[in-house]
From Swiss-Prot:
The gene is glyA. It comes from the Bacteria. The record marks 228 as: Plays an important role in substrate specificity. This is Serine hydroxymethyltransferase. GO terms for cellular component: cytosol. The modification N6-(pyridoxal phosphate)lysine is found at residue 229.
């Protein structure tokens, strides 16, 4: 028999210590990884609830297990809220991740060997958009499009690739592109060759929900997303679409039983909480600050002599090329980590370095904005980053920045009292 007094610390000190240390790291370090954020205590409460005990294979009111009357309510709430958030006619909230959501779309709409046109990983795409190390590039014939010399997507070049290769599906989406996608143009290109259009809005879903980035749902056949990142929910995925009974049936079957078994009801509950939070007016103000903070940081980097791929940002992230500084992404990542500033090394277009080394770093503002950083704070942070990178082997500079980071983080706790 269990008691509510049971806790990890009294039973598993090693694990408890690792969790405590991670909590300290999150409070004491500045988090600039573009795909990370802090979810609310409400979201975490749902994830830690008794719903983790319940198996619920199938969909609401059509389960293969008994006792699902309450988890049906949970999933229906999540579905209704996310449909409202993105003006979608269809929603599946069961994908365990964004990659699982993408895999389900491939399974639903394509056959092995079909041609897919997506953004090159080296130019800002995602592994699941056709990378040769992913299922998307191993099971399917993947063709990549990229960015031009100005760091922008060349839609005429995309159209030419589509005409040449006649893909069955075109993917619009990215993991490191700082500009706004033209979904109308992607729709026209897809229609010109009779292709499906899938949009992966994982990185910008929060901006879309707040009306600060174009909504892809009216243009795409299918839209996928994660529920963390800018959406600030639990780690998970969703699939959205306009009304299309044929596609809806294929998508549902591709998730269950096609690629997943029982849904994670505790995570779906957390998604429902996050979707309700995203419907609040305060969420729009948060997203506005995310974008303003990103634009501010980009201007500081440019003023300090650093190259931003595509010349700036129109969303929450930027890709900083270090080629002109003679630095690698790995060296920059390691030095900034010692200063308690967390970024991730990232390949840049035509990168001479390997993916394990890279010539760039990706920076995003969702997490620091959640903890309350505004324009004044992000100016400081951007300048501290430049201070470290300008003298990357100077441990005294790194220590000085780390002390400043500690003071700033203490002023803006992630989880206050």
């Amino acid at each position: 028999m269990f008691t509510k007094a049971m806790n990890i610390a009294d039973f598993d000190n090693e694990l408890a210590q690792a969790i405590a240390d991670e909590a300290t790291r999150q409070e004491d370090h500045i988090e600039l990884i573009a795909s990370e954020n802090y979810c609310s205590p409400r979201v975490m409460e749902a994830q830690g609830s008794c719903l983790t005990n319940k198996y619920a294979e199938g969909y609401p009111r059509k389960r293969y297990y008994g006792g699902c009357e309450y988890v049906d309510i949970v999933e229906e709430l999540a579905i209704a809220r996310v449909k409202m958030l993105f003006a979608a006619d269809y929603a599946n909230v069961q994908p365990h991740s964004g990659s699982q959501a993408n895999a389900a779309v491939f399974l639903a709409l394509l056959e092995p060997g079909d041609t897919v046109l997506g953004m090159d990983l080296d130019h800002g795409g995602h592994l699941t958009h056709g990378s040769k190390v992913s299922f998307s590039g191993k099971t399917y014939n993947s063709i990549g499009y990229g960015i031009d010399d100005k760091g922008l997507i060349d839609y005429d070049a995309v159209a030419q690739l589509a005409e040449k290769h006649r893909p069955k599906m075109i993917i619009a989406g990215f993991s490191a592109y700082s500009q706004v996608l033209d979904f109308q143009r992607f729709r026209e290109i897809a229609d010109s060759v009779g292709a499906y259009l899938m949009v992966d809005m994982a990185h910008v879903a929060g901006l879309v929900a707040a009306g600060l980035y174009p909504n892809p749902v009216p243009f795409a056949d299918v839209v996928t997303s994660t529920t963390h990142k800018t959406l600030r929910g639990p780690r998970g995925g969703i699939i959205l679409a306009k009304a299309n009974p044929t596609i809806e049936k294929k998508l549902n079957s591709a998730i269950f039983p096609g690629s997943q078994g029982g849904p994670l009801m505790h995570v779906i509950a957390a998604k429902a909480v996050a979707f309700k939070e995203a419907l609040e007016p305060s969420f729009q103000k948060y997203q506005e600050q995310v974008v303003e903070n990103a634009k501010t940081m980009a201007k500081v980097f440019i003023a300090r002599g650093y190259d931003i791929v595509s010349g700036g940002t129109q969303n929450h992230l930027m890709l900083v090329s270090l080629i002109n500084k003679g630095l690698t992404g790995k060296a920059a990542n390691d030095a900034l980590s010692r200063a308690h500033i967390t970024v991730n090394k990232n390949s840049v277009p035509n990168d001479p370095q390997s993916p394990f080394v890279t010539s760039g770093i990706r920076i995003g503002t969702p997490a620091i904005t959640t903890r309350g950083f505004g324009v004044n704070e992000v100016k400081k942070v951007a300048n501290w980053i430049c201070d470290v990178l300008d003298d990357i082997d100077n441990e005294e500079v790194i220590l000085n920045v780390r002390n400043k980071v500690a003071e700033l983080c203490a002023e803006f706790p992630v989880y206050g009292q």
